[in-house]
Amino acid sequence: MRLPIFLDTDPGIDDAVAIAAAIFAPELDLQLMTTVAGNVSVEKTTRNALQLLHFWNAEIPLAQGAAVPLVRAPRDAASVHGESGMAGYDFVEHNRKPLGIPAFLAIRDALMRAPEPVTLVAIGPLTNIALLLSQCPECKPYIRRLVIMGGSAGRGNCTPNAEFNIAVDPEAAACVFRSGIEIVMCGLDVTNQAILTPDYLATLPELNRTGKMLHALFSHYRSGSMQSGLRMHDLCAIAWLVRPELFTLKPCFVAVETQGEFTSGTTVVDIDGCLDKPANVQVALELDVKGFQQWVAEVLALAS
């Protein structure tokens, strides 16, 4: 039986790969997509998500979400993904539109209609998820679990300690981690290992139309290089859903720093139990890289 999922995203070049996997992995049933400001503005992430859905002829409803963090000024990662968020490929025009309600309400409505609890997957800042949990707490029993790409037990990638998705909206992340729902965190500890090799990247143009499109995007992606390999951060959250045996997880207490002058956005991961607090997150710490690369090749071969 396919696993029903809702995907909250901020496309983003590596988001595009994660979306492809969510659509084409035969184990998954992607029922709803929502967008959030992150890699670029929410207007751009929404446009990019709709372009991808049209490219794959995927009839999946999409709702536009939060344009700004809960309390902070927005920031983006255009230096990594290009000003449009998906630089490098010219998508054809279409007339698709997002749903007419905010993302968190679209998630609420879809959860309440679902015949069974649904897995939420968040691969951008957690603003929409925090709004859902704070404004619609009655939805919690309908959430099977939340799988996120975000955080780190060690080094950051936008500050010395903070990972980008958490650092964009630390208050939202703090709200989510305090919520009591089941959380799996695929952070930089594993996503920095999730590298597609130059040899594999070179095969993409001959793979299928998705391979050609992704190869064009990857030439503008600045998380690695075509010569040294590219990190597939967001794809790890989808990979865990399909191939959890590729990941080593540890239950930990995780809190988000919201006050520090130099540490705001840091995920404080208590690996050794120093704080004597109950674990609230399953934290991915190791990845079977070869197994991950093999799975990516398999799923992208299906993305025609």
Swiss-Prot record:
Q: Coiled-coil annotation: which residues?
A: none
Return the broad EC class: hydrolase
Q: Name one GO cellular component term.
A: cytosol
One annotated GO molecular function: uridine nucleosidase activity
Note the superkingdom of the native organism: Bacteria
UniProt keyword list: Glycosidase, Hydrolase
Keyword Hydrolase listed? The answer is yes
One Pfam family name from the record?
A: IU_nuc_hydro
Can you tell me which residues form the catalytic site?
Answer: 233
Q: Does the keyword Hydrolase apply?
A: yes
Output one GO BP term: purine nucleoside catabolic process
For this protein, the record's HAMAP family field holds: Nucleosid_hydro_RihC (MF_01432)
- Give the family per the record: Belongs to the IUNH family. RihC subfamily.
Q: What does this protein do?
A: Hydrolyzes both purine and pyrimidine ribonucleosides with a broad-substrate specificity.
PANTHER family in alphabetical order:
INOSINE-URIDINE PREFERRING NUCLEOSIDE HYDROLASE, NON-SPECIFIC RIBONUCLEOSIDE HYDROLASE RIHC
- In Swiss-Prot or TrEMBL terms, this protein is called Non-specific ribonucleoside hydrolase RihC
Gene designation: rihC
